[in-house]
């Protein structure tokens, strides 16, 4: 039974998404909600993220929205270090502040500002050590920063009984096509 899931994947700019009202964001959020609802039906309690722009913050927004129907779901934001949003523009910082105000738990792995790339690796390892499952939205066809976490995840799974769902663009495309078809049918 999955009690705690870590959701991660592409940063928004790695998907060439620069606005939250882009149609792609809507579909990604619908997909994430779909995945989480299945896990909630099986006893999911916590969703953890590290607070990165893109898949992680969209997932946080989905969790906040799901709380209306699943009030027991909890959102935890565990950042690699303090001040990880300092270089973000005001709009993104305001969005992040709004999300953390609605989170059930917030903490940083390192209680310092950025010191080195090792902080990201240690935060990734923390997530693996403290969750039952990972949803990683990443496709080897579009290589980007999640490739480092994927390598760590695969190695971790080889040594443990940890499980994950690595979501490819094909799976996303199938979901979007099905969603669009069902929405078209509802208008007939």
UniProtKB/Swiss-Prot annotation:
A Pfam family the protein falls into: YpsA
Family stated for the protein in its record: Belongs to the UPF0398 family.
Name recorded for this polypeptide: UPF0398 protein SERP1017
Species, as recorded: Staphylococcus epidermidis (strain ATCC 35984 / DSM 28319 / BCRC 17069 / CCUG 31568 / BM 3577 / RP62A)
Classification of source organism: Bacteria, Bacillati, Bacillota, Bacilli, Bacillales
């Amino acid at each position: 039974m999955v009690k705690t899931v870590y959701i991660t994947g592409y940063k928004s700019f790695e998907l060439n998404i620069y606005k939250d009202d882009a149609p792609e964001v809507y579909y990604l959020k619908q997909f994430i909600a779909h995945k989480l609802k299945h896990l909630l039906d099986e006893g999911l309690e916590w969703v953890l993220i590290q607070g990165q722009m893109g898949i992680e913050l969209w997932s946080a927004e989905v969790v906040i929205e799901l709380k209306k129907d699943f009030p027991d779901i909890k959102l935890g934001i565990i950042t690699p270090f303090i001040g990880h949003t300092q270089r973000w523009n005001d709009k993104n910082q305001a969005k992040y502040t709004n999300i953390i105000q609605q989170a059930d738990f917030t903490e940083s792995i390192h209680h310092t500002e950025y010191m080195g790339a090792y902080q990201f690796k240690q935060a990734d390892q923390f997530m693996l050590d403290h969750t039952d499952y990972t949803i990683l939205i990443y496709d080897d066809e579009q290589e980007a920063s999640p490739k480092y976490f994927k390598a760590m995840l695969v190695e971790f799974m080889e040594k443990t009984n940890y499980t994950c769902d690595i979501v490819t663009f094909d799976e996303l495309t199938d979901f979007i096509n099905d969603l669009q078809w069902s929405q078209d049918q509802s208008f007939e």
